[in-house]
UniProtKB/Swiss-Prot annotation:
Lineage: Archaea, Methanobacteriati, Methanobacteriota, Stenosarchaea group, Methanomicrobia
CDD domains in the cross-refs: PBP2_HisGL4
GO cellular component, one term: cytoplasm
Gene from which this protein is expressed: hisG
Activity control summary: Feedback inhibited by histidine.
Primary site of residence: cytoplasm
UniProt keyword list: Amino-acid biosynthesis, ATP-binding, Cytoplasm, Glycosyltransferase, Histidine biosynthesis, Magnesium, Metal-binding, Nucleotide-binding, Transferase
Protein known as: ATP phosphoribosyltransferase
Cited SUPFAM superfamilies: GlnB-like (SSF54913), Periplasmic binding protein-like II (SSF53850)
E.C. code: 2.4.2.17
Family: Belongs to the ATP phosphoribosyltransferase family. Long subfamily.
Cofactors (names): Mg(2+)
GO molecular function: ATP binding; ATP phosphoribosyltransferase activity; magnesium ion binding
Pathway: Amino-acid biosynthesis; L-histidine biosynthesis; L-histidine from 5-phospho-alpha-D-ribose 1-diphosphate: step 1/9
Pfam family, one: HisG
Length: 284
């Protein structure tokens, strides 16, 4: 049995549930109020846990695989197999001070207090800079601490910076960049082939999000021109259409970020009846 630990709440919960659903491993009959949930594979089950606990759960073998933030893995210094950067949930740990503060860099904080939910990362960051600070560990509402005299600055997670601005704080330095990772227990990763299958399934979703499937018709006389526009993964697929005219159907996979320009070129080359479709999964 493979146990996958996933965040039981917070900003990572829903995107993680959705990604596994798209990968073909939906949560069955479970919710974040339960400890466990089944999947459509009898050998795989989900374990709902605090995102901060998942690195150590995986390290210690309580879970075989986990989904959590790189910031939390670094904070706990957990010894786990880093299988895959899932490219969502990106955020930065930033050093921030009150808007009216004269502090403009980490160097100005020598001998001062820095509040954070990430004391490990914060202490290592300032140690590497050769700056002595007092780390004030908090469990939430970190933004409040400079305004009530508990700290001179904070190190906090920020996705857009909106919360900091709302609380009259300004970012002076970026401490750490984080995204969401698929991790595994070292020993289990060596022996369980199904862990590689899970990784492949999630990779297929990631690859598909960046691609689009194009279908179109075109006169057979412009096929060479279309090939120049549509290299595809291994070249476009071209099929004869049963028609009174010499028409072919052309299929190709293209990068999503060039769809607009590609369609313009295809129309100019003579393609018509162009369809653009999302791809659910794409396995190399």
């Amino acid at each position: 049995m493979i146990r996958i630990a996933i965040p039981n709440k917070g900003r990572l919960h829903e995107p993680t549930i959705q990604m596994f659903k798209e990968a073909g491993l939906p949560v069955l009959g479970g919710s974040n109020r339960k400890l466990f949930a089944k999947t459509n594979d009898p050998e795989i089950t989900f374990l709902f846990a605090r995102a901060a606990d998942i690195p150590e759960y995986v390290q210690d073998g309580a879970a075989d695989v986990g989904i959590t933030g790189l910031d939390l893995i670094s904070e706990t210094e957990s010894d786990v197999e880093m299988l895959l950067d899932l490219k969502y949930g990106g955020a930065d740990l930033v050093l921030a001070v009150p808007e009216e503060s004269d502090i403009s860099s980490a160097n100005d904080l020598d001998g001062m207090r820095v509040a954070t939910e990430f004391p490990g990362i914060t202490a290592r960051y300032f140690k590497d800079l050769g700056i002595k600070i007092d780390v004030v560990k908090v469990s939430g509402a970190c933004e409040m601490t400079p305004h009530v005299g508990i700290a001179d600055a904070i190190v906090d997670i920020s996705s857009s910076g909106t919360t900091l601005v709302m609380n009259h704080l300004k970012v002076i330095e970026k401490v750490f960049s984080s995204s969401i990772y698929l991790i595994a227990n070292h020993e289990t990763a060596k022996t369980e082939e199904k862990i590689e299958h899970i990784k492949t399934a999630l990779e297929s979703v990631m690859h598909a999000k960046a691609k689009r499937y194009l279908m179109m018709n075109a006169p057979i006389t412009v096929v060479d021109d279309l090939k120049e526009v549509l290299p595809g993964l291994a070249g476009p697929t071209i099929m004869k259409v049963e028609s009174k005219e010499d028409i072919v159907a052309v299929h190709a996979v293209v990068d999503a970020d060039i769809i607009f320009a590609t369609i313009t070129k295809l129309k100019a080359a003579g393609a018509f009846d162009i369809l653009v479709m999302p791809i659910e999964r794409m396995i190399p």
